[in-house]
Amino acid sequence: MNKLLLKGVAAAFCMATMFGTTACGDDDDLVNVEPPVEKTQDVILEGEITSDMTLKAADNNLLRGFVYVTDGVTLTIEPGTVIKGEKSSKGSLIVERGGKLIAEGTAEKPIVFTSDQPKASRTYGDWGGLILCGKSIVNNTAGEAQIEGGPRSYYGGKDPEDNSGIVKYVRIEFAGYPLEPNKEINGLTCGGVGRGTTIEYVQVSFCGDDSFEWFGGTVNAKHLIAYKGWDDEFD
């Protein structure tokens, strides 16, 4: 009985050793593959955006002059992306009627629009701002008007449910400047924006004109913060 037991234990030990050695040999053959690292690119936006486009958090994104998201086009911005407005050209982003901006950040990874100047040198009005133009109803005879601060874009229409996209968990900093007398670009300007649009958890700070301004429209914005604007915080 004892001899049989000892033989069984010895056999089990040998098998375990054999399989253990084989397993170790297999591990030595494994190759660890590192996940690809996304390279940083310099992305300069200028003129018209005429096809769908996505801005990535890994890139250096710059607005140069007036940048237009045209009718039928969607500009998507990843959470955590930083977009800088060029001071020398007063970079500005204008979403025209029929265009869409999908800027949906998160509480942990907000989307930030800010100045291209060094952090210690940023100030009021370094760049233009963000303008949304929709097809919702407005209170004038023509039913449409040219947007304040936008040299060519119109807003207004007959669709109260119009959708200009999503602006959520977004910060807008050091924007706002007078394009012409009584025609200023604000931090966030909404012209005829419809209730199909989502505007939530948006903070505008250190704006050179109004932090937020609305011209007609039916959008229901909520959770907005205006901090130390030069003119009106909400207009």
Q: How should each PLM-predicted stretch be described?
A:
Residues 19-23:
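C-terminal motif of bacterial Sec signal peptides marking the signal peptidase cleavage site
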Residues 1-10:
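Bacterial N-terminal signal peptides that target proteins for export
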Residues 11-12, 16:
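Repetitive helical segments and hydrophobic/amphipathic motifs
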Residues 25-235:
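Beta-strand/loop edge motif enriched in small/polar residues
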